[in-house]
Amino acid sequence: MLYYLLKYINDAFDPPGLGVIEFLTFRASAAAVTSLLICLVAGPAFIKYLKGRIIEPVKEEAPPEHRKKKELPTMGGIMIIFAIEVSVFLWARFDDPHVWLIMVAVFWMGVIGFLDDYMKVVLKVKGGLPPRYKLIGQVLLGLFIGLYTWFDPAFSVLLSTTTVPFFKNLTIDYGIFYIPVVIFIITAVSNAVNLTDGLDGLASGSSAIVVFALGGFAYLAGNAVYASYLKIPFIPGGGEIAVVSMAIVMACVGFLWFNSNPAEIIMGDTGSLALGSAIAVIALLIKQELLLPVLAGIFFLETLSVSLQVLYFKYTKMRFGQGRRIFLMAPLHHHFQLKGWAEQKIVIRFWIVTVLFFLASLMTLKLR
Protein backbone atom coordinates (compact mmCIF):
# COMPACT_ATOMS: atom_id res chain seq x y z
CA MET A 1 0.00 0.00 0.00
CA LEU A 2 2.79 2.43 0.89
CA TYR A 3 4.51 1.48 -2.36
CA TYR A 4 1.49 2.58 -4.40
CA LEU A 5 1.09 5.80 -2.41
CA LEU A 6 4.73 6.78 -2.83
CA LYS A 7 4.65 5.79 -6.49
CA TYR A 8 1.62 8.03 -7.04
CA ILE A 9 3.36 10.96 -5.33
CA ASN A 10 6.49 10.35 -7.40
CA ASP A 11 4.57 10.17 -10.68
CA ALA A 12 2.43 13.21 -9.88
CA PHE A 13 4.97 15.57 -8.31
CA ASP A 14 8.38 14.03 -9.08
CA PRO A 15 10.04 14.97 -5.77
CA PRO A 16 13.81 14.37 -5.74
CA GLY A 17 14.89 10.96 -4.50
CA LEU A 18 11.47 9.32 -4.37
CA GLY A 19 12.11 7.39 -7.57
CA VAL A 20 14.01 4.92 -5.38
CA ILE A 21 10.63 3.34 -4.63
CA GLU A 22 10.90 1.54 -7.99
CA PHE A 23 14.06 -0.31 -6.96
CA LEU A 24 13.61 -3.85 -5.66
CA THR A 25 16.62 -3.54 -3.38
CA PHE A 26 15.15 -0.46 -1.67
CA ARG A 27 11.75 -2.04 -1.13
CA ALA A 28 13.29 -5.30 0.06
CA SER A 29 15.37 -3.34 2.58
CA ALA A 30 12.34 -1.29 3.64
CA ALA A 31 10.27 -4.44 4.10
CA ALA A 32 13.08 -5.96 6.16
CA VAL A 33 13.39 -2.94 8.45
CA THR A 34 9.61 -2.67 8.84
CA SER A 35 9.28 -6.34 9.71
CA LEU A 36 12.10 -6.15 12.25
CA LEU A 37 10.73 -3.02 13.92
CA ILE A 38 7.23 -4.50 14.21
CA CYS A 39 8.63 -7.50 16.09
CA LEU A 40 10.93 -5.46 18.32
CA VAL A 41 8.27 -2.88 19.21
CA ALA A 42 5.27 -5.21 19.56
CA GLY A 43 7.19 -8.13 21.06
CA PRO A 44 7.34 -7.10 24.75
CA ALA A 45 3.62 -6.24 24.94
CA PHE A 46 2.69 -9.40 23.03
CA ILE A 47 4.76 -11.60 25.34
CA LYS A 48 3.35 -9.87 28.42
CA TYR A 49 -0.19 -10.54 27.19
CA LEU A 50 0.47 -14.23 26.51
CA LYS A 51 2.26 -14.95 29.80
CA GLY A 52 0.02 -16.94 32.08
CA ARG A 53 -2.58 -17.34 29.33
CA ILE A 54 -0.99 -19.36 26.52
CA ILE A 55 1.62 -21.70 28.00
CA GLU A 56 3.49 -24.30 25.93
CA PRO A 57 2.79 -27.85 27.19
CA VAL A 58 5.94 -29.97 27.52
CA LYS A 59 5.89 -33.69 26.79
CA GLU A 60 6.79 -35.98 29.67
CA GLU A 61 9.33 -37.86 27.53
CA ALA A 62 11.17 -34.64 26.65
CA PRO A 63 14.83 -34.29 27.76
CA PRO A 64 15.24 -32.94 31.32
CA GLU A 65 16.67 -29.65 30.02
CA HIS A 66 13.63 -29.25 27.78
CA ARG A 67 11.14 -29.58 30.65
CA LYS A 68 12.23 -26.20 32.00
CA LYS A 69 10.27 -24.58 29.17
CA LYS A 70 6.89 -25.47 30.64
CA GLU A 71 6.21 -21.88 31.72
CA LEU A 72 6.94 -20.31 28.34
CA PRO A 73 4.15 -18.66 26.33
CA THR A 74 3.61 -20.06 22.85
CA MET A 75 1.84 -18.91 19.65
CA GLY A 76 4.68 -16.47 19.00
CA GLY A 77 4.13 -17.28 15.34
CA ILE A 78 1.29 -14.76 15.42
CA MET A 79 3.88 -12.01 15.84
CA ILE A 80 5.95 -13.38 12.94
CA ILE A 81 2.95 -13.64 10.62
CA PHE A 82 1.69 -10.17 11.56
CA ALA A 83 5.09 -8.61 10.86
CA ILE A 84 5.35 -10.39 7.50
CA GLU A 85 1.85 -9.55 6.32
CA VAL A 86 2.06 -5.86 7.30
CA SER A 87 5.52 -5.39 5.77
CA VAL A 88 4.54 -7.06 2.52
CA PHE A 89 1.28 -5.11 2.41
CA LEU A 90 3.23 -1.86 2.71
CA TRP A 91 6.13 -2.49 0.35
CA ALA A 92 5.30 -5.21 -2.19
CA ARG A 93 3.45 -5.00 -5.49
CA PHE A 94 0.19 -6.91 -5.41
CA ASP A 95 -0.17 -7.04 -9.17
CA ASP A 96 2.44 -9.81 -8.98
CA PRO A 97 0.74 -13.15 -8.20
CA HIS A 98 3.92 -14.52 -6.61
CA VAL A 99 3.46 -12.12 -3.71
CA TRP A 100 -0.02 -13.01 -2.64
CA LEU A 101 0.47 -16.75 -3.28
CA ILE A 102 3.20 -16.69 -0.63
CA MET A 103 1.02 -14.59 1.65
CA VAL A 104 -1.89 -17.01 1.26
CA ALA A 105 0.43 -19.88 2.18
CA VAL A 106 1.77 -18.09 5.27
CA PHE A 107 -1.69 -17.10 6.47
CA TRP A 108 -3.35 -20.44 5.73
CA MET A 109 -0.74 -22.61 7.45
CA GLY A 110 -0.57 -20.05 10.26
CA VAL A 111 -4.28 -20.64 10.85
CA ILE A 112 -3.76 -24.43 10.84
CA GLY A 113 -0.91 -24.04 13.32
CA PHE A 114 -2.96 -21.66 15.46
CA LEU A 115 -5.79 -24.19 15.70
CA ASP A 116 -3.28 -26.83 16.78
CA ASP A 117 -1.72 -24.56 19.43
CA TYR A 118 -5.10 -23.34 20.64
CA MET A 119 -6.41 -26.88 21.10
CA LYS A 120 -3.27 -27.87 23.01
CA VAL A 121 -2.83 -24.91 25.34
CA VAL A 122 -6.34 -23.48 25.73
CA LEU A 123 -8.72 -26.38 25.21
CA LYS A 124 -6.18 -28.82 26.76
CA VAL A 125 -6.72 -31.37 24.00
CA LYS A 126 -3.79 -33.79 24.18
CA GLY A 127 -1.86 -33.68 20.93
CA GLY A 128 -3.79 -30.68 19.65
CA LEU A 129 -5.27 -30.76 16.18
CA PRO A 130 -5.40 -34.38 14.94
CA PRO A 131 -2.62 -35.04 12.37
CA ARG A 132 -5.13 -35.93 9.65
CA TYR A 133 -6.64 -32.44 9.82
CA LYS A 134 -3.19 -30.84 9.58
CA LEU A 135 -2.53 -33.02 6.56
CA ILE A 136 -5.84 -32.01 4.99
CA GLY A 137 -4.90 -28.34 5.47
CA GLN A 138 -1.50 -28.90 3.85
CA VAL A 139 -2.99 -30.85 0.95
CA LEU A 140 -5.60 -28.14 0.34
CA LEU A 141 -2.90 -25.48 0.24
CA GLY A 142 -0.79 -27.56 -2.13
CA LEU A 143 -3.83 -28.19 -4.31
CA PHE A 144 -4.62 -24.47 -4.44
CA ILE A 145 -1.03 -23.45 -5.28
CA GLY A 146 -0.72 -26.22 -7.84
CA LEU A 147 -4.01 -25.50 -9.60
CA TYR A 148 -3.50 -21.74 -9.58
CA THR A 149 -0.03 -21.91 -11.10
CA TRP A 150 -1.24 -24.53 -13.59
CA PHE A 151 -4.10 -22.44 -14.97
CA ASP A 152 -2.83 -18.86 -14.54
CA PRO A 153 -1.22 -17.64 -17.81
CA ALA A 154 1.39 -15.74 -15.77
CA PHE A 155 3.00 -19.07 -14.90
CA SER A 156 2.62 -20.71 -18.31
CA VAL A 157 6.24 -20.12 -19.42
CA LEU A 158 7.76 -22.85 -17.25
CA LEU A 159 4.69 -24.35 -15.62
CA SER A 160 5.53 -27.94 -14.62
CA THR A 161 9.22 -27.76 -15.59
CA THR A 162 12.00 -27.36 -13.05
CA THR A 163 15.80 -27.30 -13.01
CA VAL A 164 18.18 -29.85 -11.52
CA PRO A 165 21.00 -28.53 -9.29
CA PHE A 166 24.59 -29.05 -10.55
CA PHE A 167 23.41 -29.60 -14.15
CA LYS A 168 23.48 -26.75 -16.68
CA ASN A 169 20.83 -27.79 -19.19
CA LEU A 170 19.03 -30.61 -17.42
CA THR A 171 15.37 -29.99 -16.64
CA ILE A 172 12.54 -32.16 -15.41
CA ASP A 173 8.96 -31.85 -16.56
CA TYR A 174 6.61 -33.16 -13.88
CA GLY A 175 3.75 -33.25 -16.35
CA ILE A 176 0.61 -34.69 -14.77
CA PHE A 177 2.53 -35.21 -11.52
CA TYR A 178 3.09 -31.47 -11.06
CA ILE A 179 0.24 -30.91 -8.59
CA PRO A 180 1.06 -34.02 -6.48
CA VAL A 181 4.68 -32.82 -6.34
CA VAL A 182 3.57 -29.36 -5.15
CA ILE A 183 1.40 -30.96 -2.47
CA PHE A 184 4.24 -33.23 -1.34
CA ILE A 185 6.82 -30.43 -1.12
CA ILE A 186 4.55 -28.08 0.82
CA THR A 187 3.56 -30.87 3.22
CA ALA A 188 7.11 -32.15 3.67
CA VAL A 189 8.80 -28.79 4.22
CA SER A 190 6.15 -27.37 6.56
CA ASN A 191 6.34 -30.53 8.68
CA ALA A 192 10.15 -30.45 8.60
CA VAL A 193 10.32 -26.92 10.02
CA ASN A 194 7.72 -27.94 12.59
CA LEU A 195 9.93 -30.84 13.72
CA THR A 196 12.96 -28.55 13.94
CA ASP A 197 11.19 -26.12 16.28
CA GLY A 198 12.36 -27.79 19.47
CA LEU A 199 15.14 -25.60 20.85
CA ASP A 200 15.37 -21.88 21.54
CA GLY A 201 16.10 -20.07 18.29
CA LEU A 202 16.69 -23.18 16.20
CA ALA A 203 13.75 -22.95 13.80
CA SER A 204 13.67 -19.14 13.61
CA GLY A 205 17.40 -18.78 12.98
CA SER A 206 17.58 -21.63 10.47
CA SER A 207 14.50 -20.37 8.63
CA ALA A 208 16.00 -16.89 8.37
CA ILE A 209 19.13 -18.28 6.71
CA VAL A 210 17.18 -20.48 4.28
CA VAL A 211 14.71 -17.76 3.27
CA PHE A 212 17.55 -15.25 2.86
CA ALA A 213 19.15 -17.63 0.37
CA LEU A 214 15.87 -18.18 -1.46
CA GLY A 215 15.36 -14.42 -1.61
CA GLY A 216 18.76 -14.09 -3.27
CA PHE A 217 17.86 -16.76 -5.80
CA ALA A 218 14.53 -14.99 -6.43
CA TYR A 219 16.26 -11.66 -7.06
CA LEU A 220 18.59 -13.30 -9.59
CA ALA A 221 15.76 -15.26 -11.23
CA GLY A 222 13.72 -12.07 -11.65
CA ASN A 223 16.49 -10.44 -13.69
CA ALA A 224 16.76 -11.76 -17.26
CA VAL A 225 20.48 -10.92 -17.55
CA TYR A 226 21.47 -12.62 -14.28
CA ALA A 227 19.23 -15.61 -14.95
CA SER A 228 20.69 -16.12 -18.42
CA TYR A 229 24.27 -15.83 -17.16
CA LEU A 230 23.73 -18.24 -14.27
CA LYS A 231 21.63 -20.68 -16.32
CA ILE A 232 18.68 -20.54 -13.95
CA PRO A 233 15.03 -20.10 -15.01
CA PHE A 234 13.99 -16.50 -15.65
CA ILE A 235 10.86 -15.81 -13.59
CA PRO A 236 9.09 -12.69 -14.97
CA GLY A 237 8.23 -10.47 -12.02
CA GLY A 238 9.83 -12.96 -9.66
CA GLY A 239 12.04 -10.29 -8.16
CA GLU A 240 9.09 -9.27 -5.98
CA ILE A 241 9.64 -12.53 -4.12
CA ALA A 242 12.85 -10.98 -2.80
CA VAL A 243 10.78 -8.26 -1.11
CA VAL A 244 8.59 -10.87 0.57
CA SER A 245 11.63 -12.97 1.49
CA MET A 246 13.36 -10.11 3.29
CA ALA A 247 10.19 -9.40 5.25
CA ILE A 248 10.16 -13.05 6.34
CA VAL A 249 13.88 -13.07 7.16
CA MET A 250 13.71 -10.04 9.44
CA ALA A 251 10.47 -11.20 11.05
CA CYS A 252 12.42 -14.31 12.04
CA VAL A 253 15.33 -12.19 13.27
CA GLY A 254 12.98 -9.92 15.23
CA PHE A 255 11.34 -12.95 16.77
CA LEU A 256 14.77 -14.42 17.51
CA TRP A 257 15.46 -11.37 19.70
CA PHE A 258 12.94 -12.84 22.15
CA ASN A 259 13.31 -16.51 21.20
CA SER A 260 17.07 -16.84 21.68
CA ASN A 261 18.20 -18.83 24.70
CA PRO A 262 16.79 -18.42 27.30
CA ALA A 263 13.62 -17.90 25.28
CA GLU A 264 10.85 -15.57 26.41
CA ILE A 265 8.38 -17.00 23.90
CA ILE A 266 7.99 -19.96 21.53
CA MET A 267 6.64 -19.69 17.99
CA GLY A 268 4.55 -22.86 18.27
CA ASP A 269 2.98 -24.59 15.29
CA THR A 270 1.50 -21.21 14.35
CA GLY A 271 4.93 -20.01 13.31
CA SER A 272 6.70 -23.20 12.25
CA LEU A 273 4.01 -24.37 9.84
CA ALA A 274 3.70 -20.87 8.35
CA LEU A 275 7.46 -20.54 7.84
CA GLY A 276 7.74 -24.03 6.39
CA SER A 277 4.99 -23.35 3.87
CA ALA A 278 6.65 -20.05 2.89
CA ILE A 279 9.96 -21.81 2.23
CA ALA A 280 8.23 -24.47 0.14
CA VAL A 281 6.15 -22.05 -1.94
CA ILE A 282 9.05 -19.67 -2.60
CA ALA A 283 11.22 -22.57 -3.76
CA LEU A 284 8.44 -23.84 -6.01
CA LEU A 285 7.78 -20.43 -7.55
CA ILE A 286 11.44 -19.83 -8.44
CA LYS A 287 11.89 -23.42 -9.64
CA GLN A 288 14.47 -24.32 -6.98
CA GLU A 289 12.49 -26.95 -5.08
CA LEU A 290 15.03 -29.67 -5.95
CA LEU A 291 17.68 -27.55 -4.22
CA LEU A 292 15.84 -27.74 -0.89
CA PRO A 293 17.53 -30.97 0.31
CA VAL A 294 20.80 -29.02 0.09
CA LEU A 295 19.73 -25.51 1.09
CA ALA A 296 17.29 -26.65 3.79
CA GLY A 297 19.49 -29.59 4.69
CA ILE A 298 19.11 -29.11 8.45
CA PHE A 299 15.34 -29.50 8.14
CA PHE A 300 15.89 -32.55 5.93
CA LEU A 301 18.22 -34.15 8.51
CA GLU A 302 15.78 -33.50 11.35
CA THR A 303 12.97 -35.15 9.38
CA LEU A 304 15.20 -38.03 8.29
CA SER A 305 16.18 -38.72 11.90
CA VAL A 306 12.51 -39.07 12.88
CA SER A 307 11.70 -41.29 9.90
CA LEU A 308 14.69 -43.58 10.49
CA GLN A 309 13.95 -43.79 14.21
CA VAL A 310 10.34 -44.82 13.66
CA LEU A 311 11.06 -47.28 10.85
CA TYR A 312 13.99 -48.92 12.65
CA PHE A 313 12.03 -49.19 15.89
CA LYS A 314 9.11 -50.86 14.11
CA TYR A 315 11.41 -53.18 12.15
CA THR A 316 13.39 -54.34 15.20
CA LYS A 317 10.22 -54.80 17.22
CA MET A 318 8.81 -57.03 14.49
CA ARG A 319 12.14 -58.82 13.94
CA PHE A 320 13.38 -59.22 17.52
CA GLY A 321 10.26 -58.63 19.61
CA GLN A 322 11.72 -55.47 21.12
CA GLY A 323 12.06 -52.08 19.49
CA ARG A 324 15.53 -50.58 19.18
CA ARG A 325 16.59 -47.01 18.45
CA ILE A 326 19.22 -45.46 16.22
CA PHE A 327 19.21 -42.16 18.10
CA LEU A 328 18.83 -41.51 21.81
CA MET A 329 15.79 -39.44 20.85
CA ALA A 330 14.41 -37.93 17.67
CA PRO A 331 14.36 -35.32 16.17
CA LEU A 332 18.13 -35.02 15.90
CA HIS A 333 18.51 -31.99 18.19
CA HIS A 334 17.11 -33.99 21.13
CA HIS A 335 19.67 -36.72 20.45
CA PHE A 336 22.47 -34.23 21.04
CA GLN A 337 20.70 -32.87 24.11
CA LEU A 338 20.71 -36.33 25.67
CA LYS A 339 24.38 -36.71 24.75
CA GLY A 340 25.04 -33.77 27.06
CA TRP A 341 25.46 -30.93 24.58
CA ALA A 342 24.35 -27.54 25.87
CA GLU A 343 21.27 -26.17 24.11
CA GLN A 344 23.07 -23.03 22.95
CA LYS A 345 25.86 -25.14 21.45
CA ILE A 346 23.40 -27.34 19.53
CA VAL A 347 21.56 -24.33 18.13
CA ILE A 348 24.69 -22.44 17.08
CA ARG A 349 26.22 -25.54 15.51
CA PHE A 350 23.01 -26.24 13.61
CA TRP A 351 23.05 -22.61 12.40
CA ILE A 352 26.64 -23.09 11.23
CA VAL A 353 25.63 -26.25 9.36
CA THR A 354 22.73 -24.32 7.80
CA VAL A 355 25.15 -21.62 6.62
CA LEU A 356 27.36 -24.34 5.11
CA PHE A 357 24.33 -25.74 3.29
CA PHE A 358 23.59 -22.19 2.12
CA LEU A 359 27.11 -21.88 0.71
CA ALA A 360 26.79 -25.29 -0.95
CA SER A 361 23.57 -24.14 -2.61
CA LEU A 362 25.35 -21.03 -3.92
CA MET A 363 28.00 -23.27 -5.45
CA THR A 364 25.31 -24.91 -7.58
CA LEU A 365 25.03 -21.63 -9.50
CA LYS A 366 28.48 -22.16 -11.00
CA LEU A 367 29.14 -25.89 -10.59
CA ARG A 368 27.03 -26.96 -13.54
UniProtKB/Swiss-Prot annotation:
- Family assignment from sequence similarity: Belongs to the glycosyltransferase 4 family. MraY subfamily.
Write down the membrane topology: Multi-pass membrane protein
Q: Which HAMAP family match?
A: MraY
InterPro entries on file = Glycosyl_transferase_4 (IPR000715), PNAcMuramoyl-5peptid_Trfase (IPR003524), PNAcMuramoyl-5peptid_Trfase_CS (IPR018480)
| EC category name | transferase
Indicate yes or no for the key word Magnesium. yes
Q: Which organism is it from?
A: Chlorobium limicola (strain DSM 245 / NBRC 103803 / 6330)
Q: Which cofactor does it need?
A: Mg(2+)
A Pfam family this chain is assigned to: Glycos_transf_4
E.C. numbers: 2.7.8.13
Per its UniProt record, what NCBIfam families does this chain match? mraY (TIGR00445)
Q: Which UniProt keywords apply?
A: Cell cycle, Cell division, Cell inner membrane, Cell membrane, Cell shape, Cell wall biogenesis/degradation, Magnesium, Membrane, Metal-binding, Peptidoglycan synthesis, Transferase, Transmembrane, Transmembrane helix
- GO MF: metal ion binding; phospho-N-acetylmuramoyl-pentapeptide-transferase activity; UDP-N-acetylmuramoyl-L-alanyl-D-glutamyl-meso-2,6-diaminopimelyl-D-alanyl-D-alanine:undecaprenyl-phosphate transferase activity
As for subcellular location, the record says: Cell inner membrane
Query: Which biological pathway?
Result: Cell wall biogenesis; peptidoglycan biosynthesis
Q: Which domain of life does the protein's organism represent?
A: Bacteria
Q: Name one GO cellular component term.
A: plasma membrane
User: What is this protein identified as?
Assistant: Phospho-N-acetylmuramoyl-pentapeptide-transferase
